[in-house]
Amino acid sequence: MENISEKAIIKGKIGKNCKIGEGVIIDENVVIGDNNIIDPYTIITGYTTIGDNNHIYSHAVLGSEPQDLKYHGEKTELIIGNNNKIREFTLINPGTEGGGAVTKIGDNNLLMGYVHVAHDVIIANNCILANAATLAGHVELEDYVVIGGMTPVHQFVKIGAHAMIGGASAVAQDIPPFTIAEGNRAKLRGLNLTGLRRRFQNRSDIDAIKKAYKELFESGKPLKDTAKEILESTDNEYVKHLCEFVLNSKRGIPYDRKV
């Protein structure tokens, strides 16, 4: 107990080797795993489950009621995985009945200061949200997404793996995997080649993604027809994922269509 401040208010379940600062409030329905650091004046409430080896910085608020007028006190959850860094003044809400009743954050993510994660959001693994990035309800991020600071993302938008969003953008449509988007409203600006070169060992995969991107977004052909054609002819798993993302998009893809 030597790592838990006497000035913390703890009603929930705490794992082994956790360090909890003064003024922290952990309510009765919270479950926290092992080796977590929770800095002073953080509030963790609601039906919140947190894994192992996370660092939650001062004044973060996790699990407070969804900011949704349709929410009327139903039992909904916030689930956070392992090895995440959640910086100062971040706000993360649980889910709502209309969205599966759960907000989920995976492993190895960095949420910088003043980030907001709204109800029913899904964040996968290894994502970075820079300062004051804002995810509205039901947004979904696949692995290795990077979102620049001061960027809001509209409700129900999906952002694909390895995509990067420029700072001070406004994202209103789905952003495919492996791409860069920027602007208000954000549009595709090309491929996230720097990120791909860092993470992909096989150069032929990057070349295949480049070719597919040009066919999809620079050929002037109908987008979904082109995605179907490529999907039927490719064996590359990343190209398949790109095409399937395009075909399954519900909010559309923001790009400048060639004539």
From Swiss-Prot:
Its EC number is 2.3.1.129. It comes from the Bacteria. GO terms for cellular component: cytoplasm; membrane. Keywords: Acyltransferase, Cytoplasm, Lipid A biosynthesis, Lipid biosynthesis, Lipid metabolism, Repeat, Transferase. Pfam families: Acetyltransf_11, Hexapep. GO terms for biological process: lipid A biosynthetic process. GO terms for molecular function: acyl-[acyl-carrier-protein]-UDP-N-acetylglucosamine O-acyltransferase activity. Pathway: Glycolipid biosynthesis; lipid IV(A) biosynthesis; lipid IV(A) from (3R)-3-hydroxytetradecanoyl-[acyl-carrier-protein] and UDP-N-acetyl-alpha-D-glucosamine: step 1/6. It catalyses: a (3R)-hydroxyacyl-[ACP] + UDP-N-acetyl-alpha-D-glucosamine = a UDP-3-O-[(3R)-3-hydroxyacyl]-N-acetyl-alpha-D-glucosamine + holo-[ACP]. PROSITE patterns: HEXAPEP_TRANSFERASES (PS00101). Its main location: cytoplasm. It is found in: Cytoplasm. Homotrimer. Involved in the biosynthesis of lipid A, a phosphorylated glycolipid that anchors the lipopolysaccharide to the outer membrane of the cell. Belongs to the transferase hexapeptide repeat family. LpxA subfamily. This is Acyl-[acyl-carrier-protein]--UDP-N-acetylglucosamine O-acyltransferase. It comes from Nautilia profundicola (strain ATCC BAA-1463 / DSM 18972 / AmH).
